[in-house]
UniProtKB/Swiss-Prot annotation:
The keyword Secreted does not apply. InterPro entries: Arg_succ_lyase_C, Argininosuccinate_lyase, Fumarase/histidase_N, Fumarate_lyase_CS, Fumarate_lyase_fam, Fumarate_lyase_N, L-Aspartase-like. It comes from Erwinia tasmaniensis (strain DSM 17950 / CFBP 7177 / CIP 109463 / NCPPB 4357 / Et1/99). CDD domains: Argininosuccinate_lyase. GO terms for biological process: arginine biosynthetic process via ornithine; L-arginine biosynthetic process. This is Argininosuccinate lyase. It comes from the Bacteria. The gene is argH. Gene3D superfamilies: Fumarase/aspartase (C-terminal domain), Fumarase/aspartase (Central domain), Fumarase/aspartase (N-terminal domain). Keywords: Amino-acid biosynthesis, Arginine biosynthesis, Cytoplasm, Lyase. Its EC number is 4.3.2.1. It is an enzyme of class 4 (lyase).
Length: 457
């Protein structure tokens, strides 16, 4: 059933119909379309288009249709309807006859689809917020179990300073907290109802759009009908949120892929999230993490595609805007799947503490401590930095750690160095001294875990 046709004297070419139809993907908006239609039927009563009895008959039929859709959403795809709006209207007419043809009075598919999509987006934001918080909780639990698991921290993929596995986990908690905040901000701008704006100039019926917005669970109604039917900022924002969130997940995946290598050997992933090789029987591949890392491209691509779709569109609605859904659906599905998978990766991960400790003790990661020691003795930092660089060269020549150099060797580079330097160079001292907020000391880690647990409770 097409919702238009009187203007045309020839049927649409079947090839055009296949090109034009959107039911194959916008069927996912069926529930929202039905819910919006129920609210619209109530609004039509207030302007005397429908009687209360007619509205009740329509609502009863729409509620029955909603139950059918929830039981078997795939049934929709068997139809040759143009889009989800025509499918719902056709089914409604099947149930109530000519009365179903009155429902679209004063409404356009332009404000209808905008409403459907916003309702769907609101539901998705709620689900993504839950998934984001669940992953944060998994990270916090992993951090709590590994507060004293010392490992090297890296810059330029070179060992830099000692940190703990807990500190690494908490770094991603912070990233995910920002993702959560972005979603909450997006929801504020998303939470306005388009319904009642018509095709572009508003509805000709004196409907209370604020009341209508409340029936649909929106905070308020939009202020300008022309902007409303043209607006897809919420799609761009959600795609941007997803893109940033996926970048964070990709970095998480890349770190663990490296930690899991034989060369690093810091962690071992559970069999539940790894796979083998068809040829090499010894292989245990981090496929879950590699797929998370690999799926960033499709999400970033959806954001770019939507930006390009919108950039040259005149007001108001254009058919180009039909391209808003497939990329959005896929991107948000992908982000949610990857959040759940990232949490699963942490379930059963083994941190190899002895190997982490060994790696942290290598690479002269305590060099900054020696520089700070010299500064405390009155040596200007830039000079201390140079002295420590020379000392590291000497240690490399001897093939020993800094703390293994004899005092006489250390004093070749600065006479202020004394026996009291050796406790300063211990790994534990390196950690304990980082006790300012956000640092890697056990006290700061414990406090950060407590604060994160309270926030996520």
């Amino acid at each position: 059933m097409a919702l238009w046709g009187g203007r045309f004297t020839q049927p649409a070419d079947q090839r055009f119909k296949q090109f034009n139809d959107s039911l194959r993907f916008d069927y996912r908006l069926a529930e929202q379309d039905i819910i919006g239609s129920v609210a619209w039927s109530k609004a039509l009563v207030t302007v005397n288009v429908l009687t209360a009895a007619e509205q009740q008959q329509l609502e009863s039929a729409l509620t029955a249709l909603l139950d059918e859709v929830r039981a078997d959403p795939q049934q929709i795809l068997a139809s040759d309807a143009e889009d989800i709006h025509s499918w719902v209207e056709g089914k409604l007419i099947d149930k109530v006859g000519a009365l179903g043809k009155k429902l679209h009075t004063g409404r356009s598919r332009n404000d209808q689809v905008a409403t459907d999509l916003k309702l769907w987006c609101k539901e998705q934001v709620s689900e993504l917020l839950n998934a984001t918080r669940q992953f944060q909780q998994a990270l916090v639990a992993t951090a709590e179990a590994h507060q004293d698991a010392v490992m090297p921290g890296y810059t330029h993929l070179q060992r830099a300073q000692p940190v703990t596995f807990a500190h690494w986990c908490l770094a991603y908690v912070e990233m995910l907290a920002r993702d959560e905040s972005r979603l909450q901000d997006t929801l504020k701008r998303l939470d306005v109802s388009p319904l009642g704006c018509g095709a572009l100039a508003g509805t000709a019926y004196d409907i209370d759009r604020e009341q209508l917005a409340g029936w649909l669970g929106f905070a308020s109604a939009t202020r300008n009908s022309l902007d409303t039917v043209s607006d897809r900022d919420h799609v761009l924002e959600l795609l941007s949120d997803a893109s940033i969130g996926m970048v964070h997940l990709s970095r998480f995946a890349e770190d663990l892929i490296f930690f899991n290598t034989g060369e690093a050997g810091f962690v071992e992933l559970s069999d539940k999230v790894t796979s083998g090789s068809s040829l090499m029987p010894q292989k245990k591949n981090p496929d879950a993490l590699e797929l998370i890392r690999g799926k960033v491209g499709r999400v970033q691509g959806a954001l770019t595609a939507m930006s390009m779709t919108l950039k040259g569109l005149p007001l108001a609605y254009n058919k180009d805007m039909q391209e808003d859904k497939e990329g959005l659906f896929d991107a948000l599905d992908t982000w949610a799947d990857c959040l759940h998978m990232a949490a699963l990766v942490l379930d059963g991960i083994q941190v190899k503490r002895p190997r982490c400790q060994e790696a942290a003790e290598q690479g002269y990661a305590n060099s900054t401590e020696l520089a700070d020691y010299l500064v405390a003795k009155g040596v200007p930092f830039r000079e201390a930095h140079h002295i420590v660089g020379e000392t590291v060269v000497e240690a490399i020549k001897q093939g020993v750690a800094l703390e293994a150099l004899k005092l006489s060797d250390l004093q070749k580079f600065s006479h202020v160095i004394g026996d009291d330097v050796y406790p300063i160079l211990s790994l534990q001292s390196c950690l304990d001294k980082r006790n300012a907020k956000g640092g890697v000391s056990l006290h700061q880690i414990s406090q950060a875990i407590t604060e994160a647990k309270q926030r996520l409770a």
